[in-house]
Design a protein with these regions (language model features):
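Flexible, polar/acidic helix-loop-strand segments at domain edges
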Residues: 114
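Protein kinase glycine-rich loop
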Residues: 118
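Noncatalytic scaffold domains of N-terminal-nucleophile
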Residues: 1-53, 58-111, 170, 181-186
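Internal maturation/activation junctions in enzymes
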Residues: 12, 23-25, 30, 44, ...
Length: 221
């Protein structure tokens, strides 16, 4: 219901192209954090301290207390105020790949970044410009690449502090094997099987066999 309040402001099925979406609660949160920074700057403190004040306003202020109340009411207190207040970020080494001459850096497995790496590595095997922007073939390739990347991400990705992610997952060689599963004449009917990056196999032997594409994927050329 709390999501419907925002996404279905005009009623279910009544959102149209150009509908104005107003997230008042998010606006209040951002202003709350801005006010904390301004109070810090008004005291003559440097901007770095002001930024920390905005951060603490979120993790140690009323928003954190609201998170605590919500989880106690709906999710048996799985996240608490103490969890919020005790959280501290850290510096991470970014993931890296290349795409047609460009260097691409993303955050690690706790973010959406690795999915981008997987997708770009597969897309590099296709000449998207030759396919033509937004043509049926162009959209088909991108949609199939997204499906393959999401299948692998559901199997292998997670916070690297708690999940061992095979380093081979991000290699170009593995992406090439996965891209071979794409049939230009038929789309995946369901989520495709996850692969086996450690052994450079397009499909892992333990993956579900509900794969409904061609029984034998055409060799990628």
């Amino acid at each position: 219901p709390y999501n419907a309040k925002y996404w279905l402001q005009n009623g279910a099925g009544r959102q149209t192209l150009g509908s104005l979406m107003v997230n008042e609660d998010l606006g209040k949160l951002i202003r709350y954090m801005i006010d904390a920074e301004r109070k810090s700057l008004a005291k003559g403190e440097p901007r770095e301290i002001g930024i920390w004040a905005a951060r603490d306003a979120f993790y140690k202020g009323e928003p954190a207390k609201a998170v605590d109340r919500f989880f106690k009411e709906h999710l048996d207190g799985q996240m608490t105020y103490e969890d919020m207040a005790g959280y501290g970020g850290k510096w991470d080494t970014p993931l890296h790949t290349t795409y047609r001459g460009y260097d691409v850096y993303t955050c690690d497995g706790w973010s959406q970044g690795p999915r981008l790496i997987l997708m770009l590595n597969m897309l590099e095997n296709y000449d998207l410009q030759l396919l033509g922007y937004n043509t049926a073939e162009y959209i088909h390739v991108i949609s199939q690449v997204i499906n393959l990347a999401m299948s692998d991400s559901h199997k292998y990705l997670g916070d690297p502090d708690f999940v061992d992610i095979p380093e081979e997952l991000y290699t170009k060689a593995y992406a090439r094997e996965r891209a071979k599963l794409i049939d230009m004449d038929e789309a995946f009917q369901d989520m495709p099987p996850w692969g086996d990056p450690v052994h450079m196999k397009a499909i892992h032997p333990d993956s579900p066999t509900s794969f409904t594409g061609r029984e034998t994927a055409k060799e990628w050329k």
